[in-house]
């Protein structure tokens, strides 16, 4: 259970500063998740992770680290790490030794660049603790990636592909040193209690997905069943989440990669059709709050789509890009681009369709292929896609927030020892006049973020 207290002025100021002075929400002692107001007389639950920072007073609290040792810990084989990854481990050990002396919670956010190898690094940490561990991921698509990494430790593990009910039945007769689960498992109270009693290490993968100032499964778990040792893994941390994990290790990876950003500029005559006109009519309505109709109209821009397809084919045929990822926002746009590419490049083109069960096996196959084009959606491939050798990224959609942009760029920024060149292709123009300005603004915003991440911009006329 978290620390329960009335929040005085000093604590209130500290918590508000931590969340960037945005509204502060916590559970009160009645179990209600409410906004914390200054001088409130309610008692609130302060998450354990808040006390992980040495600048925070402990109010006489001490934290223990559990005794749930792996029964097969003598079998552990730690994975090989790159020098930069070993530096992260050394920094964590140094920080945790200080926390142990002060009896603080062993919590930290690992802010590591996309392509750093967070999964391998976290697996190494699990192995060094030698205590039972649970890894939580936001969706099933990432489970296989974790299984590949965890299995190398050579201790017992279970990856829960079939839901929490099946897992609880399995755990009645068997125990495992490591569980890898989807976050929805934590909606089950019995599972939360089991984890709290039997597992000491908790890994929250893709922590940026969760806004812990909102009431959610993860907010409840971290507050009412606080892990003894906890890692948040992310390339793009949320400031609001610092209340739950108030310690961070920030490593920027220096690499020899040559990063090039191509902004393709082609002028088009205006184009429309009945479907586009229907989408355009929704642009100024609340239905377009998340630019859904902007993307629907853009997906039907036949002139822009032709430019994209032609550039992909040219890049692939001239060996400027050998392992290409093509990203769309909408599924129908993905299929349009895929079909057009297949007409020319046939079996070199693959479809990353989240609706097909065979996609997971296909992704695994692509890790062993030297020349391919994968067409997928931002939802499927933007976070957690495990194909380390990608070298080129084509962005077909236009509207992304900064977190999504950085995540998708990370798909091609892994230093795998192959070709040192990494390329991004943006398409800044459209033939649909009603969205032309917006497409330009969002594309330029993406380009600005790419340059901050080390990409050198080159303008090209198609």
UniProtKB/Swiss-Prot annotation:
Keyword Disulfide bond in record: no
Binding site residues for ATP: 112-119
Keyword Cytoplasm annotated: no
Cellular location(s): Virion
Keywords: ATP-binding, DNA-binding, Helicase, Hydrolase, Late protein, Nucleotide-binding, Transcription, Virion
Domain Helicase ATP-binding: 99-255
Helicase C-terminal domain span: 308-459
EC number: 3.6.4.-
GO molecular function, one term: ATP binding
Main location: virion
Sequence motif DEAH box, location on chain: 205-208
Function: DNA helicase which seems to act as a postreplicative transcription termination factor. Involved in ATP-dependent release of nascent RNA. Forms a stable complex with single-stranded DNA, and to a lesser extent RNA.
Protein family (similarity comment): Belongs to the helicase family. Poxviruses subfamily.
Name assigned to this protein: Transcript termination protein A18
Taxonomic source organism: Fowlpox virus (strain NVSL)
